[in-house]
């Protein structure tokens, strides 16, 4: 039952997710591709996390933060992708009212936590390259733990605002969400209640997270670039550029997509373009991150070779 009579109002008890396409052939193709991407995402990020845990040479702040980015990527993708895969296999996919709220808050939590973790990684590289003598002091174990806890706390706050906003909405019908998951904007469009304080707070907080973290990353890498250009050692400059290039590639993909989905006015692009960008943001980027960070990182490649060598000769 999709609707429930409550006095003078009709309340929605479930939503219909329209998904990416109605073409049955295309649905099978997309199911296969996205399933493969999801399996690579989980296995790739888990492998990176385990490698960092078991390799003593990777027990440094940068890789500590990277392991948490991997955990968040798994969580973010898992909050949406399995549900999307089910959507490809059925004619009409419904999601319960409570399930929609859980999916919305989960995506808000993991997305916000990743923003803060990426900013934390930028600060870590800033200290390592611009203030190397103070690195061990400024990036102590206690500081690293506090930064990670702060990142997750930011995620919890945004998720709390999102779920409070969701439960404050009054859905009278229709209940068809033109998306493949319960995103905030489509739900606001379906709501028949007035925009309230919780919606405004959620919007302001989400925008503030994006602006603040981008500002931290931009300032950190401006100083990093200046410091690298001043380096006399060609080898040192090359190593610093190599590490920074991997990070900046991941950040550009992440924030470029976030900007397109949540910052660019909706009138500038179609709903289908928004869906494609969301697939890239939620499904593809979590798969690419371990590849981006690993392929140009000699420490990770070296640690992987050593672990594989141990397995071969054990």
From Swiss-Prot:
This protein's name: Olfactory receptor 5P67
Lipid bilayer topology: Multi-pass membrane protein
Family listed: Belongs to the G-protein coupled receptor 1 family.
Glycosylation sites: 8, 268
Extracellular side: 1-28, 79-102, 158-199, 262-274
GO MF assignments: G protein-coupled receptor activity; olfactory receptor activity
Keyword Cell membrane assigned: yes
């Amino acid at each position: 039952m999709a609707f429930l009579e409550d006095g003078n109002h009709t309340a929605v008890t479930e939503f219909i997710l329209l998904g990416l396409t109605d073409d049955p052939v295309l649905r099978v193709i997309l199911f296969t591709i996205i399933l493969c991407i999801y399996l690579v995402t989980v296995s790739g990020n888990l492998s990176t996390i385990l490698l960092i845990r078991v390799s003593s040479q990777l027990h440094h702040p940068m890789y500590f933060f990277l392991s948490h980015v991997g955990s968040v990527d798994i969580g973010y993708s898992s909050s949406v992708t399995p549900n999307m895969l089910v959507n490809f296999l059925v004619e009409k996919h419904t999601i319960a009212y409570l399930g929609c709220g859980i999916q919305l808050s989960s995506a808000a939590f993991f997305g916000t936590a990743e923003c803060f973790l990426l900013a934390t990684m930028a600060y870590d590289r800033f200290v390592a390259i611009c203030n190397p003598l103070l690195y061990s002091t400024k990036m102590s174990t206690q500081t690293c733990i506090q930064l990670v806890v702060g990142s997750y706390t930011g995620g919890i706050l945004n998720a709390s605002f999102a779920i409070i906003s969701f439960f404050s909405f009054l859905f009278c019908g229709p209940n068809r969400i033109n998306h493949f998951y319960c995103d905030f904007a489509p739900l606001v469009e379906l709501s028949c209640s007035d925009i309230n304080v919780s919606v405004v707070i959620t919007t302001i907080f989400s925008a503030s997270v994006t602006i603040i973290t981008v500002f931290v990353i931009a300032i950190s890498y401006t100083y990093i670039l200046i410091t690298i250009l001043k380096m006399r050692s060609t080898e040192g400059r090359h190593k610093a550029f190599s590490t920074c290039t991997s990070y900046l590639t991941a950040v550009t993909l992440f924030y470029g997509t976030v900007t397109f989905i949540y910052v660019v006015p909706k009138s500038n692009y179609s709903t289908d373009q928004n869906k494609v960008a969301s697939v890239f943001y939620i499904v593809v980027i979590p798969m690419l991150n371990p590849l981006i960070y690993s392929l140009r990182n000699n420490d990770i490649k070296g640690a992987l070779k050593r672990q594989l060598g141990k397995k071969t000769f054990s």
